[in-house]
Swiss-Prot record:
GO terms for molecular function: flavin adenine dinucleotide binding. It is a multi-pass membrane protein. InterPro entries: CBS_dom (IPR000644), CBS_dom_sf (IPR046342), CNNM (IPR002550), FAD-bd_PCMH-like_sf (IPR036318), FAD-bd_PCMH_sub2 (IPR016169), Ion_transp-like_CBS (IPR044751), Transptr-assoc_dom (IPR005170). Residues 2-190 form the CNNM transmembrane domain. NCBIfam families: PRK11573.1. It comes from Haemophilus influenzae (strain ATCC 51907 / DSM 11121 / KW20 / Rd). PANTHER family: HEMOLYSIN-RELATED, UPF0053 INNER MEMBRANE PROTEIN YFJD. The chain crosses the membrane at residues 3-23, 65-85, 92-112, 126-146. One of its GO terms (cellular component) is plasma membrane. It comes from the Bacteria. This is UPF0053 protein HI_0107. Its main location: membrane. The keyword RNA-binding does not apply.
Amino acid sequence: MDSIPLSTLFIILIICLVLSAYFSGSETGLLSLNKYRLRFLSEQGNKGAKKAEKLLEKPDTLLSFILIFNNLVNISASAIATVIGMRLYGDAGVAIATGLLTFVMLVFSEIFPKTVAAMHAEKVSFFSSHILTSLLKIFYPLVWLMNIFTKSLMQIVGLKLDMQKQVISSEELRSIVSEAGEATPNEQHPQMLLSILDMETVTVDDIMVPRNEIGGINIDDDWRAIMRQLNHAAHNRVVLYKGSLDEQVLGILRVREAFRLLLEKNEFTKETLIRAADEVYFIPESTPLKTQLANFRTNKERIGLVVDEYGDIKGLVTLEDILEEIVGDFTTSTAPSIDKEVIQQSDGSMIIDGSANLRDLNKMFNWELDTEDARTFNGLILEHLEEIPDEGTICEIDGLLITILEVGDNMIKQAKVVKL
């Protein structure tokens, strides 16, 4: 290199530093890309995104190529800087060149380009992917040879190169949806997606109408009572039973069909009502909502009775109940709304009905009440106290100061709640 002018050496040194910055920035930019947005842009026809996605299909090959050439230009820059230093300062120039080059490379070829690439990953990656794709085709034999040595070394030390495609977990997907929801003006859409994810873990037992609130018709009642129950039915289908739910469930009666028969038949008897009822559809209490939604569709059912492992009726669930878990309460729903079960007080406290669903309370107030052993607010308090409390009893559960206001029928009707 003694015959090469200093000006030429400086130009070559600058080129090496620029190339080092390019490879460093390209590596950071490509590895910082959001793979879901990258896939979306690629499907939209973005050429840079398509090439970047293609490069990232084989990350080992891409990294090998970038590291080979990044090290090559760094070593070249170090050699040239040493020659320049010795020409200018003699033997002391080696130390001077080492110190200056280390600073320059750290700032201009590492920190600066990687910071820019991390902040503008798409712009940097899509631009560099065009160049990297062409260079990789030219130097692929060299990269392939280096990968052979690398894989051989990994086998010697007992490591396996696992390039299997990673599958996103439901919790990771939940995090992605939550982050995307922060940038979405419509809060309902991400909430619906999160509700769909919840259907994997939520069971019919969590959302069912409890047994004591099931609206049904006792065929042993007189006609006036039967007509009154038909007129005030909460759903378009009601449970038809004899004596009680424990004794004999006769079927599920369509309210509209009952009124049609009443108008068309001159002799409308209880036997006619029983024959008009559909066969009862039973649902195990541990059935996930996702599964039950599919079962409703497959069996062409809209309502079912939830039973426990002993076959005892625990509650009732409808197709509408499951859909409301996704989209929220329907305006036409006659089921009690959580808004009606919670009364805000001027002092910041609130009055909560004992029948309020714990999952709904957690959603509304961002609480973390345990829903594993209890489904309602009444059940949570009873589980904590292990007895039916007297009115005026005060307890603390999960950061909530709870005062029992009304007790009746062996359950807590209302309680005052203050967030501590």
